[in-house]
Amino acid sequence: MDDNKKRALAAALGQIERQFGKGAVMRMGDHERQAIPAISTGSLGLDIALGIGGLPKGRIVEIYGPESSGKTTLTLSVIAEAQKNGATCAFVDAEHALDPEYAGKLGVNVDDLLVSQPDTGEQALEITDMLVRSNAVDVIIVDSVAALVPKAEIEGEMGDMHVGLQARLMSQALRKITGNIKNANCLVIFINQIRMKIGVMFGSPETTTGGNALKFYASVRLDIRRTGAVKEGDEVVGSETRVKIVKNKVSPPFRQAEFQILYGKGIYRNGEIIDLGVSQGLVEKSGAWYAYQGNKIGQGKANAAKYLAENPAIGAEIEKQIRDKLLTSGAVAAAGKAAAVEADADDMADADAGY
């Protein structure tokens, strides 16, 4: 840059700082770049697939999927993990369906959880914005976008047409709160539901509620699906769950994670540690036996996971090694390519099957 341009730029920067305050424009090289802070999801595999060890703070996240796929369970798991590190969490229950007993079983400290059950969509989003602007709340869950009913719709008759009201409400609210979320370094998670588009001949007919604004403003979008049942004998005790990262602004997207959600217990984390430990060569598997550092820890995955539950220090040690090994840029990039290929293959299979 020549001297005239340098002087002109310095004058412009000086004028901007006087008018808008120091820090209105910054040179990236003047400040040390820091990793984006993250909050664990409670699933080790999903934390690794996200690339930064969890969901990013200071960003908007959307989690969507069919009914009974584990959306609320996953968000309650995020709250439980955040509370372990002293975070303040809030749950905006627009569906009026939060079960405190179930939340407690998943590890949520219900006594410290802030809960709001608003009457209208405007009230829910205004409460969310006020909590964000307080700079005192670390995680806010909005459950769900589909239940954010505009005031005009609630006050109207049952058969009245209100075209695009909810989409306009979401668009206006997200414009307003995005900057506040970044300044407060708060994680805001919107749970969303799936609807079917009528008359779609090619491609997926599925869409999410609330218009397109949330798709643009969300830094991470997670598609969660139930893929099967977990059984003990003939009794169904949980769900096989797959999460696809449809959008990711903080790491390469299109990865996926698979884990089990056990009814009344939440994400089967010790089972994930065993599986990932074996795949990374940290846990030895010989026949049905699992061993760690030469010591047998159980016959069968269930017994090995039970051993880790009884010896949390060993489980934490294995988990730390897995995170150190996989949450490096090279390992994450390699894992991302493999998962993207696998996800593409799954999408093609789904399309062939007519899903």
Curated annotation (Swiss-Prot):
Binding site for ATP: G65, P66, E67, S68, S69, G70, K71, T72
Gene3D superfamilies on file: P-loop containing nucleotide triphosphate hydrolases (3.40.50.300)
Ligase listed as a keyword: no
Pfam families associated with the record: RecA (PF00154), RecA_C (PF21096)
Classification via CDD domains: RecA (cd00983)
SUPFAM superfamilies named in the record: P-loop containing nucleoside triphosphate hydrolases, RecA protein, C-terminal domain
Superkingdom, natural source: Bacteria
GO molecular function, one term: ATP binding
Coiled-coil residue windows: none
Keyword ATP-binding: yes
Cellular component GO terms, alphabetical: cytosol
InterPro entries: AAA+_ATPase (IPR003593), DNA_recomb/repair_RecA (IPR013765), DNA_recomb/repair_RecA_CS (IPR020584), P-loop_NTPase (IPR027417), RecA-like_C (IPR049261), RecA-like_N (IPR049428), RecA_ATP-bd (IPR020588), RecA_C_sf (IPR023400)
Main location: cytoplasm
Record localization: Cytoplasm
The entry's keywords: ATP-binding, Cytoplasm, DNA damage, DNA recombination, DNA repair, DNA-binding, Nucleotide-binding, SOS response
One GO-annotated biological process of the protein: DNA repair
NCBIfam families membership: tigrfam_recA
Its biological purpose: Can catalyze the hydrolysis of ATP in the presence of single-stranded DNA, the ATP-dependent uptake of single-stranded DNA by duplex DNA, and the ATP-dependent hybridization of homologous single-stranded DNAs. It interacts with LexA causing its activation and leading to its autocatalytic cleavage.
Sequence similarity: Belongs to the RecA family.
Name used for this protein in its record: Protein RecA
Source species: Pseudomonas putida
Gene name, Swiss-Prot/TrEMBL: recA
